[in-house]
From Swiss-Prot:
Catalytic activity, EC: 4.2.1.33
UniProt organism field: Brucella anthropi (strain ATCC 49188 / DSM 6882 / CCUG 24695 / JCM 21032 / LMG 3331 / NBRC 15819 / NCTC 12168 / Alc 37)
Pathway assigned in UniProt: Amino-acid biosynthesis; L-leucine biosynthesis; L-leucine from 3-methyl-2-oxobutanoate: step 2/4
UniProt xrefs under PANTHER family: 3-ISOPROPYLMALATE DEHYDRATASE SMALL SUBUNIT (PTHR43345:SF5), 3-ISOPROPYLMALATE DEHYDRATASE SMALL SUBUNIT 2-RELATED-RELATED (PTHR43345)
First-level EC class: lyase
Cellular component GO terms held in the UniProt record: 3-isopropylmalate dehydratase complex
UniProt GO BP: L-leucine biosynthetic process
Subunit comment: Heterodimer of LeuC and LeuD.
Protein name per the record: 3-isopropylmalate dehydratase small subunit
GO MF annotations, alphabetized: 3-isopropylmalate dehydratase activity
Keyword set includes Cell division: no
Length: 201
């Protein structure tokens, strides 16, 4: 998993509340267990028309936002079913950070496990960031996980809270496997000692 320390990138505004995981990636794209190639399904029902052509009005199809790395979204983002494909699709598109006033718990935790930083902010701060994100190609934010701050294009900053353990994992690029490998030495020592004490096992 890639480390997340400081990210400067274009922020796309998505001022829609209750975006569920089926809206993030429809069920038609859940037939794979691969984490790559899912970007084509991200917000598919909003990004594409029925004939498969792009919907020019959807934010991620607009020229200034095609390479967005940050998503500023409405309240209760990621509600609905617990599909882990939702953060996979966001990450495959290039989204490394989602900012909202609240998230569904399972989606929130899945983001951390997949290298995405979900940030909860107050409504007034979200309104400010949504305005900042509406500037098209100039909608650049800097998210500093070490300092726990978001810096806007005008130089202002917003502080945010994040669980210390989850922050540690993102800063060091540790997923569940990485966390286990951190303890590899202790595990090897335990296994060797157990073999001495219980050679028959």
């Amino acid at each position: 998993m890639d480390k997340f320390t400081k990210l400067t990138g274009v922020a796309a505004p998505l001022p829609i509340v209750n975006i569920d995981t089926d809206m993030i990636i429809p069920k038609d794209y859940l037939k794979t267990i691969k984490r790559t190639g899912l970007s084509k399904g991200l917000f598919a029902e909003m990004r594409f028309n029925e004939d498969g052509t792009e919907n020019p009005d959807f934010v991620l199809n607009k020229p200034g936002y095609r390479n967005a790395q940050i998503l500023v979204a409405g309240d209760n983002f990621g509600c609905g079913s617990s599909r882990e494909h939702a953060p996979w699709a966001l990450l495959d598109f290039g989204i490394r950070c989602v900012i909202s006033t609240s998230f569904a718990d399972i989606f929130y935790n899945n983001c951390f496990k997949n290298g995405i930083l979900p940030i909860k902010v107050a409504q007034e701060d979200l309104d400010k960031l949504m305005d900042d994100a509406s500037r098209g190609a100039n909608a650049t934010l800097t998210v500093d996980l070490e300092a726990k701050e978001i810096h806007g294009p005008d130089g202002g900053s917003i502080s945010f809270d994040v669980d210390d353990f989850k922050r540690h994992c993102l800063l060091n690029g540790l997923d569940d496997i990485g966390l286990t490998m951190e303890k590899a030495g202790s595990i090897d020592t335990f296994e060797a000692k157990r073999a001495e004490l219980r050679p028959w096992a």
